């Protein structure tokens, strides 16, 4: 299923996050939906690069979800999703997207 009328998702803060290598960063998005079967996705895009999958998790799932790298963990609630990046590296410098499906 795709985005349904009335569904929305947006970053909690549109900002640049500045951190040091090896630290932990948390990014979050708030969403609303009328669907009971929702998956929340995280992607990143390097400057002039393709968008790459990072993680997804069912909105109402207690399982860990799927990630492309174990440094990335996604958590969800009924109104938000959070991406935690541990052991931050210089190569994590990118634009991050959250998506609802």
Residue ranges and their predicted role:
Residues 1-101:
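Extracellular domains of the immunoglobulin superfamily
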